[in-house]
Amino acid sequence: GRYANARGSEPTWTPRAMRSLAEAEPSVFWLDDRSAPPALPSLVGAVEADLVVVGGGYTGLWTALHAKEADPDRDVTLVEAATVGWAASGRNGGFCASSLTHGEANGLDRFPDEFDTLERLGRENLDGIEATITKHGIDAEFERTGELDIAVEDWQVDELNEFARLLAEHGTDPVLLDREQTQALVHSPTYLASRYDADGVALVHPAKLAWGLRQACLDLGVRIYEHTEVTKITSDGAGLALRCPFGSIRGRQVALATNAFTNLLRRLGNYIVPVYDYVLVTEPLSPEQQDAVGWEGRQGLADLGNQFHYYRLTADNRILWGGYD
């Protein structure tokens, strides 16, 4: 959609690209949903808790949920600076993968000795996510349809074959599909081959998952305060004191689940680099458009480039695709 001008300075948008974006809405697709729950009250005054969880994304929500399930008498409080699921947990492609190493190839390269254990734990983790969704009746549009890792360049076909050989050495029986088999699943002439991971990836509505976990926590008695930023944590005898704009919390234990927002423990800044990409979402496909695309298995799709692109269908049959700028 963009090309550089003759001097190689700022790119110029083509008329066709401009027209294609004329009716686009620059918003977060998942969070802009009519099922979004109303915000919970902010913390006002002083409270105490056995465990204080800072951050209302997936990590914080699951920490609070597991802590309460493990000990129903434990007093658990969760605070979120904005609203639950507002940041990365509500702004992603909705691929729920079993890999703990951001892909098996990455795991084989960096953790070869631990790879088998990491893969086993990752599968158990994905099973646990599905079990939690089922147990608490969370309507997160969870579809365990798997993923196609797709070669779109000749060199990627060779890389795919080598990757399959390495997986076989670790006891995995990878399913490789040639050009014709891949295009039979999704009708794209650019697809040259693929690996089909039928069970290791699920699709999910990210925001609905966060909101469902929020409700599960509330049902178990977790106190949740939204629009409550923790501005400072200090030691306080046998516990910790958390300062907020309109109140404070004294906690025996604190779990920081703040992802890239590391200011409460500044030394973490040396270990975390925020990474982002963009997604676009179409209008719902018509039956004729769905027939033209194929994709009856509703698998997640991702190409094999280092700065890869990914594609998926939503519950109402829109195509969501994303990748790095």
Task: List each language-model region with its residue ranges.
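Helical element adjacent to the flavin cofactor pocket in flavoenzyme catalytic cores
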Residues: 158, 165-168, 194-252
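A non-catalytic, amphipathic alpha-helix used as a structural packing/dimerization or gating element
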Residues: 113, 117-131, 162
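Glycine-rich Rossmann-fold phosphate-binding loop(s) that bind the pyrophosphate
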Residues: 55-59, 81
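Active-site substrate-recognition segment that forms the wall
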Residues: 94-96, 127, 135-143, 230, ...
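Extreme N-terminal leader/targeting segments of oxidoreductases
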Residues: 1-51, 69-70, 74-75
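Glycine-rich active-site loop/strand segments that organize a redox cofactor
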Residues: 91-120
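Glycine-rich FAD pyrophosphate-binding loop
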Residues: 68-91
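Flavin (FAD/FMN) cofactor-binding and adjacent substrate-gating region
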Residues: 17-26, 31-33, 102-108, 131-212
